[in-house]
From Swiss-Prot:
Its EC number is 3.6.1.27. InterPro entries: UppP (IPR003824). Keywords: Antibiotic resistance, Cell inner membrane, Cell membrane, Cell shape, Cell wall biogenesis/degradation, Hydrolase, Membrane, Peptidoglycan synthesis, Transmembrane, Transmembrane helix. The lineage of its organism: Bacteria, Pseudomonadati, Pseudomonadota, Gammaproteobacteria, Alteromonadales. NCBIfam families: PRK00281.2-4 (NF001393), undec_PP_bacA (TIGR00753). The keyword Nucleus does not apply. It catalyses: di-trans,octa-cis-undecaprenyl diphosphate + H2O = di-trans,octa-cis-undecaprenyl phosphate + phosphate + H(+). GO terms for molecular function: undecaprenyl-diphosphatase activity. It is a multi-pass membrane protein. It is found in: Cell inner membrane. This is Undecaprenyl-diphosphatase.
Length: 272
């Protein structure tokens, strides 16, 4: 890859991982539409590491509290036996990650062979864009929103199942999990925060899988591309999370819905 391609793809990964517009679609499309070469396993690992570090850094305080509370539920640390909402939230996040892990393990070959196409991306971009818009309109009309404490394990698992569907390119992991969060009555801010916390084990699993594939492969490693890609993905992802949460209550999801509809229609026009 050229340095320009590294910069563009790393920034795309960082910006689109947490916006409801599908990071996988934006990484697949350059190779299919522009004819760029596949970025390779090593680069995939690098940008996953960058985005994972960004979301963990941004939510470091919440993660610290949740980790201590979770350890207390298994009889370890100062919160031993206390429980509380942070402990529940930790368990919800862990359990809600299982569907995506199972779906990814069982369906990865089918997805790679049959669903990584511009047509699939166009259709999922449009379909789940409409659903996001519907959920956002409903959320905007509500006078009261369900606090995250009232989400419950059932609600968390529904969001987790949605995250599994997001393995289909073009769906958007953050987009569909926020959509279900909004449909379940969460505010835009809480739907986004739960989605971002849920992304941590999901990105970690994906990164670990790619790392294992890289170790077992004979692919050469471009350390410059990995380092630059990881750094740019980290910076862009951190900035994206920060400003997205600031602007979300003011702008809602509609700017992203409009973008998805334009992208989906544009892709259909390009390929048909």
């Amino acid at each position: 890859m050229s340095t320009l391609e590294i910069i563009i793809l790393a920034l795309l990964q960082g910006l689109t991982e947490f916006l409801p517009i599908s990071s996988s679609a934006h990484l697949i499309l350059p190779s299919q539409v522009l004819g760029w070469q596949d970025q390779g396993l090593a680069f995939d690992v690098a940008v996953h590491v960058g985005t994972l570090l960004a979301v963990m850094m941004y939510f470091r305080k919440e993660l610290g509290v949740m980790a201590v509370a979770w350890l207390g539920t298994v009889g370890v640390g100062p919160e031993k036996g206390r429980g509380g909402f942070d402990a529940k939230l930790s368990w919800w996040i862990l359990l809600a990650t299982i569907p995506a892990g199972l779906f990814g393990l069982l369906g990865k070959d089918f997805i790679e062979e049959h669903l990584r196409s511009a047509l699939v991306i166009a259709m999922t971009t449009l379909l789940f864009g409409f659903l996001l818009g519907f959920a956002d309109i409903k959320a905007g009309k509500r006078t009261e929103h369900k606090p995250m404490e009232k989400l419950g394990l059932k609600g968390a698992m529904l969001i987790g199942l949605a995250q599994a569907v997001a393995l289909i390119p073009g769906t958007s992991r953050s987009g569909i999990t926020m959509t279900i969060g909004l449909m379940l009555g969460l505010s835009r801010d809480n739907a986004a925060r739960f989605s971002f916390l849920l992304s941590i084990p999901a990105i970690a699993m994906a990164g670990s899988y790619l790392t294992l594939k890289l170790i077992l492969s004979t692919e050469s490693v471009d350390w410059f591309a990995m380092g630059l890609g990881s750094l740019l993905a980290f910076v862009s992802a951190y900035a994206c999370i920060h400003y997205f949460l600031i602007l979300l209550e003011k702008l809602g999801m509609m700017p992203f819905v409009i973008y998805r509809l334009i992208l989906g229609v544009g892709l259909l026009w390009f390929i048909l």
